[in-house]
Amino acid sequence: MIQMQSILQVADNTGARSLMCIKVLGGSKRRYAGIGDIIKVSVKDVAPRGRVKKGEVYNAVVVRTSKGVRRADGSLIKFDGNAAVLLNAKLEPIGTRIFGPVTRELRTARFMKIVSLAPEVL
């Protein structure tokens, strides 16, 4: 469950290391974001020679949460931390590699690129 001011790790090779959620997109009163939801983020920490700069604002899709996601068969998939993948204005991933596992819930037409780049799909 991601809300405003939540700190997330970055699961791609854009050069950003940590992000802060500044808005949950999808309705004016929407408070929380889960896996597969789009959020507005600010870059808080960057690696040298990265593609993004500190302080820049991007869209991002949440790919892992500590809260996890409940499946229809009753299973619950949780992760050690919260992670997101940076997106451009057209909601396409900026990076060319994805690090760590992602869940099957991302297998929509919008995020098939992320699923295909991921090393493991749970």
Curated annotation (Swiss-Prot):
Purpose of the protein: Binds to 23S rRNA. Forms part of two intersubunit bridges in the 70S ribosome.
GO molecular function annotations of the record: large ribosomal subunit rRNA binding; structural constituent of ribosome
Keywords: Ribonucleoprotein, Ribosomal protein, RNA-binding, rRNA-binding
Xref: PROSITE patterns: RIBOSOMAL_L14
Keyword Cell membrane belongs to the record: no
Membrane-traversing stretches: none
Protein name: Large ribosomal subunit protein uL14
Record lineage: Bacteria, Pseudomonadati, Pseudomonadota, Betaproteobacteria, Nitrosomonadales
SUPFAM superfamilies registered for this protein in UniProt: Ribosomal protein L14
HAMAP family: Ribosomal_uL14
Subunit annotation: Part of the 50S ribosomal subunit. Forms a cluster with proteins L3 and L19. In the 70S ribosome, L14 and L19 interact and together make contacts with the 16S rRNA in bridges B5 and B8.
CDD domains noted in UniProt: Ribosomal_uL14 (cd00337)
Disulphide bonds in the chain: none
Record carries keyword rRNA-binding: yes
GO biological process, one term: translation
Protein family (similarity comment): Belongs to the universal ribosomal protein uL14 family.
GO cellular component, one term: cytosolic large ribosomal subunit
